[in-house]
Swiss-Prot record:
Part of the phosphoribosylformylglycinamidine synthase complex involved in the purines biosynthetic pathway. Catalyzes the ATP-dependent conversion of formylglycinamide ribonucleotide (FGAR) and glutamine to yield formylglycinamidine ribonucleotide (FGAM) and glutamate. The FGAM synthase complex is composed of three subunits. PurQ produces an ammonia molecule by converting glutamine to glutamate. PurL transfers the ammonia molecule to FGAR to form FGAM in an ATP-dependent manner. GO terms for biological process: 'de novo' IMP biosynthetic process. Mg(2+) 2 binds at residues 114, 265. This is Phosphoribosylformylglycinamidine synthase subunit PurL. Mg(2+) 1 binds at residues 90, 536. Monomer. Part of the FGAM synthase complex composed of 1 PurL, 1 PurQ and 2 PurS subunits. Its EC number is 6.3.5.3. Pfam families: AIRS, AIRS_C, FGAR-AT_linker. It is found in: Cytoplasm. It comes from Anaeromyxobacter dehalogenans (strain 2CP-1 / ATCC BAA-258). One of its GO terms (cellular component) is cytoplasm. GO terms for molecular function: ATP binding; magnesium ion binding; phosphoribosylformylglycinamidine synthase activity. It catalyses: N(2)-formyl-N(1)-(5-phospho-beta-D-ribosyl)glycinamide + L-glutamine + ATP + H2O = 2-formamido-N(1)-(5-O-phospho-beta-D-ribosyl)acetamidine + L-glutamate + ADP + phosphate + H(+). Keywords: ATP-binding, Cytoplasm, Ligase, Magnesium, Metal-binding, Nucleotide-binding, Purine biosynthesis.
Amino acid sequence: MTEPITPEIVAQHGLKPEEYQRILEHLGRTPTLTELGVFSVMWSEHCSYKSSRVHLKTFPTSGPRVLQGPGENAGVVDLGDGLAAAFKMESHNHPSYIEPYQGAATGVGGILRDVFTMGARPIASLNALRFGDPSHPRTAYLLEGVVAGIGGYGNCMGVPTVGGEVAFHPSYNGNCLVNAFTLGILPADKIFRGTAAGVGNPVMYVGAKTGRDGIHGATMASAEFDASTEEKRPTVQVGDPFMEKLLLEACLELFQTDAVVGIQDMGAAGLTSSSVEMAGRGGNGLDLFLDQVPLREEGMTPYEILLSESQERMLLVAAEGKEELVRSICEKWDLDVAVIGRVTASGRWRAHWRGAVVADLPVDPLTEGAPKYHRPMAPHPALPALHAFDAAALPEPADLGAALLRLLARPTIASKEWVYRQYDHMVRLVGAVRPGGDAAVVRLAVSHDAHAHKGIALSVGVNGRFCFLDPYLGAMHAVAECARNIACVGGEPIAITDCLNFGNPEKPEIMWQFAECVRGIGDACRAFGTPVVSGNVSLYNETEGQGILPTPTVGMVGLVEPVERTCHSTFRDAGDVIALVGSLQGEVGGSEYLSAEHGKEAGRPPALDLAREKAVQETVRRAVRAGLLSSAHDCSEGGLAVALAESCMMHEVPADGSKPAWIGCAVRIPFPVRKDFVLFGEDASRILVSLPKENAARFVDLAQQCGAPVIRLGAVGGDRLEIQGALSVPVEDLARAWRDGIPAVLRRDAAHAGTTAPA
């Protein structure tokens, strides 16, 4: 007997009444409960991008290196010499807040599958994490669980986590962010896509068995949190990295045959989304026979089978007649494998169960015909007052050295060593620059002379405070800083992926933030020649009406060639000259300093001149490639003083303890405005460099050729950070504050906790 579809059931499926009316119009009848479940997940924000798609279409997505842009499992760019890179970034925010270890672990698993589905072997991962106020009772619990989940899954897969960023802000108290990025390498002429082509071709299920975990995960990821958050724990998937490792190796072996026509990861919305999307891309229909799906639990219904988000599963369209070849390879790797359907010419998506059709839907309304909203937009009403804020009226700290120590201890600025020590960043020995620097650099793990000198630079980042105060400018800063980080290691930016994390799009101010950030990313990408080739949107990041800062995370990929000629972030040799490429403006709007010292999050983000930015980057990139520099470090959170301090102490400690993990410096800074503003302001387009004295004249000439200003500041040496007329602090004290920032958060939690998982 068919269950009646009531307004309550429609609402439980996350559908608006007007959306249900559209379903009735598409079908000309009442849907079954199973069909309603299919529409629910396919029309969720997570799968349909119904609020964001109209804005995303404005991104630049093509370029001379782009082999695959948005719309597939991952973007692909040409690295030259027959080699390509596939990469993407995705969010797993809502699951990670509910169940931090499994939420983060399965986020890593999902992004790895997106990349190797394209035919690529993953070689490097990064992540961008956001947590609440360090003093919030849940922050330490989430931090420990998320980091353990990322490390646990990635380490078992043998894919190094080579970098990333972690930041803390009260807006994330009820909604942490876990954005995972993976890059893989593949032959440029062997890209696999998620398409159901070839009428009559078999549809095959490969991987782990299907259980009840994760049902309606996509719908949950498209809703705000409330007091019932803990009840959503069953919608979080459970990952098995060892199964995923088998799946990875089996897929890569299958790609060496002629058996694979199309392949798609079963991620959000599971078998439903993967099969519908493949049918949509192929312009065909699909018949699924759910009796053939390998099941882990007894008594599962068609509804549960279709909407399960059990992990480590792939849907594959094989060439007709190649079923046994696929089966033999999958069984060799101890994977479940079954023919569960056929490609049809009907243009319809049908699910069969025990001889009956339990779902019969047209493909188009589930894909391109899904709702597309032009939601109302309006600037945030608080912005005029925030922009009018005058920082000049604030008192200047009596002790600038003490202010620097406090900034260095802020978890957003402090050393992330506690985090990356839990990740295996040395597996496969691909790292050319260790974690903790501006950008990760990985060698291409391929045995070919033409590739031996190629490396890839990777950077992720965004400043959510900037994006709140000025979404357009803040998003441009995100792209510019990633490009600047890549320039610091001698890389040439190629392309970006993004992960756009926002609050409730039904609020006009949130939709305005989103649209402005998209516009900012697009304009900056056009300026840098870095098309957007993949990405993800995560909306409804709110808890009981409180939204996060707009957080459009950017992940950028650059080419480093030759990879032997790169650069580190830390001062190297006593006597080296220290210089600033860029200028001194003392812009503190939206800065970490303003928040830390004065409790203010106001003003405007620093101005950004893209022509100046490109000149600064080109100067440093060319200097690195010419071997002129000992170090190069981007000035960002905390400003010039923090950049100087980090350059003094971001050293690996020698195993024999023969020298300390720091070196001092003495500089003289011209102060055009207040000293604290110049020291801690986060002016754009600045890179701190050090270089041997004999290279100084050549470097200044190079900067003039590129049109970038250079200010000579001082020299490396000693055991103190000395800024003439401002501060003098032992580097050992700076290092102690900097290294203890995150461990202090965990100690505070342990001291007053006594419970494993605070409510």
